[in-house]
Each structure stands twice: as C-alpha cells, then as structure tokens.
Amino acid sequence: MGQKVNPISNRLGIIRGWDSNWYGGNDYGDSLLEDSKIRKYLNARLAKASVSRIVIERTLKLVTITVCTARPGIIIGKGGQEVDKLKEELKKVTDKDIQINIFEVKRPELDAVIVANNIARQVEGKIAYRRAIKMAIANTMRMGAEGIKIQISGRLNGAEMARSEMYKEGRTPLHTFRADIDYCHAEALTKVGLLGIKVWICRGEVFGKKELAPNFTQSKESGRGNNGGNNGGKNFKRKKNNR
C-alpha cells in the first residue's frame, strides 16, 4: 500500500501537518474553494520564485498565508513592495484581511517540489532528461539526503510509444511512517506531449513527538519583509532537513 499512496497524505497526523489549518463549519465548502483559488493564483503568480509549500490558516476575520520559497527576495521585493502588491491582488479572491509570511527554504535540493519543477523546466528547455535527473540526484545526495527516487514517464526522446524510467540512489522506505519522505508530481510540456515527473526524497527519520502544526511566526527583528512579510525559518525544523 505504501508504494501506491501519496507519501505525504499517508503521513498526515503522524509526522506531517496539513497545509490548510482552520475550522469551517457550515462554510467549509466556500473556504475550501477559496483556498484552492489562492493556491492556484499564487503558484501561477510566483512561478519563478521556486515556491515549495503554501500554508493557509484562518480565523474569523483574518487569512494568514505562509509561502515557503527558495527565493524570498523575488516575493518580498524592495522594502516589501511586492508583498503589499500581492496582498492587494489577493483581496479580489477573499473579503477577509490577509497577512502574508515568507519562509525561506534553506536547502532547496532536499525539497521534492523544487527538485521536480527544476527537472521539468530543464526538460522543457530541451536539456536531456537523463542529464537533468542525474544532476538532481547528485545535488540532493550531496546535501545529506538518505535517498532519492525519480520516475519520468511519457514519450521520452520523442519515441512512438510512451514508457517509464526510474532512477534512484540510497533508501526511500515508503512503508516506514517515521521516515520523512517528501513527494511531488510535476509535468513538463514538450513538442511530443506531456512528460510526468515524480520525485521521492528521504530526509531521514523522525523520532519522538512531532509538532504537526509548525509555527512559522518570528520576531520582527529577524523578519525579511514588511507588513506581514516575515521569515519564520527558525521554528520550522526537521530531523535531517532545516527547511
């Protein structure tokens, strides 16, 4: 079963928390749709910022959005101007007050979303997929990962028949719930069609009690931006990877 299910959803409530933290009551459907629109807009708007994760927390009158990114300077802008502009744009999606926090991913080579999207962009740029995958594996293992597995599927090299190829190094124990495994599925649009790219990264094992709702907040003195553009990197830690 561990080989088939999404490794992230399989570990929810064990070593992984939810990306949406709120209680909706009778408005659950509307809030869920709003979250989907926010994520879709941010992923398109911040496509060049290497966004890894978007965490949304809601109170009665406030929506707190934490954007985990490898390139926080692109989102924050000079003096926090880009954050202010982003807040104004998001007010078209929700009628609540918005607070945006920026969290920097310290080691993007250990983040499956960033790795998968980088491979997809290279393949779309006509770089050989084997070269892109082998470079990603080497960079990830060099940064201290215990293992990585990458699968690419589709009409590879323009072949008539679609096929799948898998490359792996180290260990990725999908059945071990305490194993901190990050996963992502990305797509690369080529002239011959879509290529699917799946990435599994094992960042070690988590022992003891795990905080499922990581605290991204941080004091203003160590923040990276203005008006809610804070970097909460110190409070979000894992066994093997300080994201």
UniProtKB/Swiss-Prot annotation:
Ranges where the KH type-2 domain occurs: 38-106
GO terms, molecular function: mRNA binding; rRNA binding; structural constituent of ribosome
Family affiliation: Belongs to the universal ribosomal protein uS3 family.
NCBIfam families: rpsC_bact
Domain of life: Bacteria
One Gene Ontology term, aspect cellular component: cytosolic small ribosomal subunit
PROSITE patterns linked: KH_TYPE_2, RIBOSOMAL_S3
HAMAP family: Ribosomal_uS3_B (MF_01309_B)
Described function: Binds the lower part of the 30S subunit head. Binds mRNA in the 70S ribosome, positioning it for translation.
Name of this chain's protein: Small ribosomal subunit protein uS3
Matching InterPro entries: KH_dom, KH_dom-like_a/b, KH_dom_type_2, KH_sf_prok-type, Ribosomal_S3_C_sf, Ribosomal_uS3_bac-typ, Ribosomal_uS3_C, Ribosomal_uS3_CS
